[in-house]
From Swiss-Prot:
Signal peptide: none annotated. InterPro entries: Rhodanese-like_dom, Rhodanese-like_dom_sf, Thiosulfate_ST/Rhodanese-like, YgaP-like_TM. This is Uncharacterized protein slr1261. PANTHER family: RHODANESE-LIKE DOMAIN-CONTAINING PROTEIN 15, CHLOROPLASTIC. The lineage of its organism: Bacteria, Bacillati, Cyanobacteriota, Cyanophyceae, Synechococcales. It is a multi-pass membrane protein. It is found in: Cell membrane.
Amino acid sequence: MASSTQTNVTIAPKTLQQLRQQDAVILVDVREPLEFVGEHITDAYSLPLSRLNPSQLPQAEGKTTVLYCQSSNRSGNALQQLRSAGVEGIIHLEGGLLAWKQAGLPTVKTKNAPISIMRQVQIIAGSLVLTGVLLGSFVAPGFYFLSGFVGAGLLFAGLSGTCMMANLLGKLPYNQIKD
């Protein structure tokens, strides 16, 4: 069911699916291209939040544009940005792709898609922490600093919502997806 407040409009996954079957909505995925390639809702357009431009937003007469992301945080931000730019007739998916999948609704998964940025961050951060602990234990205690540095970076990422390691990894050639 769609709900409305002055700053936010959401739609539940099951309601969105009903509207999709009636061809009454346009879906826009605001996650990054690498995430979109890995898995997305059928017939969704990719328009990453990092490159959000109101003039590129797909819209059609008589259809509601529905934004979504992984959990609805980025789509909520995109909704606010678009509304501030004067765009009307947009809402976002409550709970994002996670809620969509939890409701048992279908997605498109790309076989052999690259590992998600967040999994890459977890692999690298875990490896650096383990390396720092092992080197600190068996080589020199100064290597514990490496584990502490990574821990501080993860703490900052959690508190700020900005992960510098993810930003850097996203710039690597193997993480670049052509739109």
